[in-house]
């Protein structure tokens, strides 16, 4: 049997040696040729023992051909759908007797050959419709011209074809073990561990094998190329390969066959018009999110743990054994599993009028419950975010009544209802963990537990007023009379904004500071917000040194809030 690597070479060969049998495969030359994928790209001739890729426009058939020169030849043809179900059939036409005997070596005139050839639809050997990887296998095939016709009726599609006359020795696809199932051996909220039996192709035959795991949320895949096709969807139209050279009546004449004129022109007309129509009507397909499907190749390990999954989510897992020498793969029987739910968090009970300290992990959540004993008309909720911003959600008897991002101190007024219960959810930021102080109260009027803050909590330093032993700073106040305490701390020359940001915990009060760091405390307010500014000169500093200044405002109940820290430096020479 001979399957040539290109149509042009095949026609020249037959023209030159009309009366002789086609030569058998030169293995050394074949191995060199199959490495050159361009020789087989979009060719209508199927090479012996090499996998080729193709592309179909919807409703537009493609035909591939090969010749088996001797009777009783083993034959294997495998078709792998990638994007969509395919319909394919394999037919056989016997070689004309005058082409199989010994000849003079001189080609006959073309017109005379046409008169000797009659149209023949051939014998149908195998048909299939679906998206499985399917094969035609025969231990003893007759000689003749074989035609493989493929069509996709759903959409434009990629596919792969492999065929060989030496299936016993080639074995390009990794062999599945006796138990080809993928097992889930461990299941967590964000992790799944998979295990499978190794392929004998690697463990027994010593072929180079690696395993690739595909994870997605939709369904299992029957081939690796189907998974890769899903991953490679673009934000633009799918790009098809350029049309290649198809067989013409001239080619068939020298094989000893010719299709009828009507069939040939009808196919040409339908192919051209369908292809044009499909090019114009192909739909825009958005690219799936990266997280929706992943492919991870892990070498020759047969146990693998997938991490960073979402809790309470169903995933589908497929394992493919890939022969890295041939780049051909075989699918194990895939599986699916649902990750475990998030552990239900303990709900913290809030007491009326009492401050509760809360810690929330990075990107984590904490739930608080407030159930006033007496009937109430209003609930006042104070939230003091000490570090990064947090999201606050409040539900009253299951109904969402508040959803806000909170930085610093915020106060919310919620309308009350008799016997109402409130569920408060605090969600941490992506940056880091959060510490909060939370207070809920039904008591109307009275002094507030947290001090009022101005919109701007920065401390301003006056550069022109710096000396070798003092600095002058200012900060904004409010219309509420509060106590302000100033603290200083000497820091190194390398101390920068990153250090300051890391230490910016607004909930740490003056009680956390050393007595030696205290500068002063004073009361301050202004009925006119435009004039609610106070200044202070801090003395007793050393020349050329850096200091971190902090201002704390203390509320009536003793709760304090820290302004943004300020880094200052005294003059070195005066």
UniProtKB/Swiss-Prot annotation:
* Occurrences of domain Fibronectin type-III (ranges): 174-329, 451-560
Q: What does this protein do?
A: Secretory protein that plays a role in various cellular processes. Acts as a chemorepellent acting on gonadotropin-releasing hormone (GnRH) expressing neurons regulating their migration to the hypothalamus. Also promotes neuron migration, growth and survival as well as neurite outgrowth and is involved in the development of the olfactory system. May also act through the regulation of growth factors activity and downstream signaling. Also regulates extracellular matrix assembly and cell adhesiveness.
Q: Which GO terms describe its molecular function?
A: heparin binding
Q: What residues bear carbohydrate chains?
A: 327
The protein in question is named Protein NDNF
Superkingdom to which the source organism belongs: Eukaryota
CC terms in the record's Gene Ontology section: extracellular region
| GO BP | cellular response to fibroblast growth factor stimulus; embryonic neurocranium morphogenesis; extracellular matrix organization; gonadotrophin-releasing hormone neuronal migration to the hypothalamus
The keyword DNA repair is annotated on this UniProt entry: no
Q: Where is this region: Disordered?
A: 97-118
User: Which region is the signal sequence?
Assistant: 1-19
The consequence of inactivating this gene is: Morpholino knockdown of the protein alters the migration of gonadotropin-releasing hormone (GnRH) expressing neurons.
* Record keywords: Glycoprotein, Neurogenesis, Repeat, Secreted, Signal
Say which species the protein is native to: Danio rerio (Zebrafish)
């Amino acid at each position: 049997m001979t399957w040539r690597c290109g149509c042009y070479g095949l026609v020249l060969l037959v023209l030159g040696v009309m009366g002789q049998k086609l030569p058998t495969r030169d293995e050394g030359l074949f191995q060199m040729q199959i490495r050159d994928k361009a020789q087989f790209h979009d060719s209508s001739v199927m090479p012996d023992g090499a996998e080729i890729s193709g592309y179909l426009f919807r409703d537009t058939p493609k035909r591939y051909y090969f010749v088996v020169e001797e009777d009783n030849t083993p034959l294997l043809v495998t078709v792998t759908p990638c994007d969509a179900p395919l319909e394919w059939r394999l037919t056989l036409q016997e070689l004309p007797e005058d082409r199989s005997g010994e000849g003079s070596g001189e080609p006959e005139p073309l017109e005379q050959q046409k008169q000797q050839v009659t149209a023949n639809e051939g014998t149908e050997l195998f048909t299939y419709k679906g998206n499985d990887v399917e094969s035609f296998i025969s231990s003893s095939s007759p000689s003749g011209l074989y035609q493989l016709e493929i069509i996709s009726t759903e959409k434009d599609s990629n596919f792969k074809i492999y065929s060989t006359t030496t299936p016993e020795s080639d074995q390009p696809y990794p062999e599945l073990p006796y138990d080809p199932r993928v097992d889930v051996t461990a299941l967590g909220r964000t992790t799944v561990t998979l295990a499978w039996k190794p392929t004998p192709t690697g463990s027994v035959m010593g072929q180079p094998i690696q395993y690739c795991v595909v994870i997605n949320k939709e369904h299992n895949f029957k081939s690796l190329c189907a998974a890769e096709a899903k991953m490679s969807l673009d934000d633009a139209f799918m790009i098809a390969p350029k049309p290649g050279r198809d067989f013409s009546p001239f080619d068939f004449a020298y094989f000893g066959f010719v299709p009828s004129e009507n069939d040939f022109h009808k196919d040409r007309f339908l192919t051209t018009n369908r292809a044009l129509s499909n090019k114009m009507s192909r739909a825009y397909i958005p690219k799936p999110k990266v997280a929706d499907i992943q492919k991870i190749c892990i070498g020759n390990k047969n146990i693998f743990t997938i991490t960073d999954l979402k809790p309470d989510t169903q995933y589908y897992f497929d394992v493919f054994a890939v022969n890295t020498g041939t780049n051909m793969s075989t699918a194990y029987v895939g599986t699916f599993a649902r990750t475990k739910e998030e552990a239900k968090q303990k709900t913290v009970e809030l007491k009326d009028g009492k401050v509760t300290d809360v810690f929330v992990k990075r990107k984590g959540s904490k739930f608080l419950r407030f159930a006033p004993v007496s009937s109430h008309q209003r609930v006042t909720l104070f939230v003091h975010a000490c570090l990064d911003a947090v999201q606050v959600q409040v539900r009253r008897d299951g109904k969402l009544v508040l959803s806000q991002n909170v930085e610093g101190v915020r106060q919310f007024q919620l309308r009350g209802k008799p016997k109402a219960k409130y569920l408060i959810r605090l969600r941490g930021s992506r940056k880091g963990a959060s510490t909060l102080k939370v207070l809920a109260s039904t008591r109307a009027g009275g002094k507030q537990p947290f001090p009022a803050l101005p919109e701007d909590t920065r401390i301003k330093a006056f550069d022109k007023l710096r000396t070798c032993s003092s600095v002058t700073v200012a900060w904004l106040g409010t219309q509420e009379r509060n106590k302000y305490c100033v603290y200083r701390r000497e820091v190194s020359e390398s101390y920068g904004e990153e250090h300051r940001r890391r230490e910016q915990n607004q909930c740490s009060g003056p009680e956390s500071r050393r007595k030696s760091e205290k500068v002063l405390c004073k009361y301050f307010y202004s009925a006119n917000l435009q004039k609610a500014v106070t200044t202070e000169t801090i003395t007793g500093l050393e020349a050329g040194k850096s200091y971190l200044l902090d201002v704390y405002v203390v509320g009536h109940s003793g709760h304090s809030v820290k302004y943004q820290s300020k880094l200052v430096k005294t003059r070195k020479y005066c």
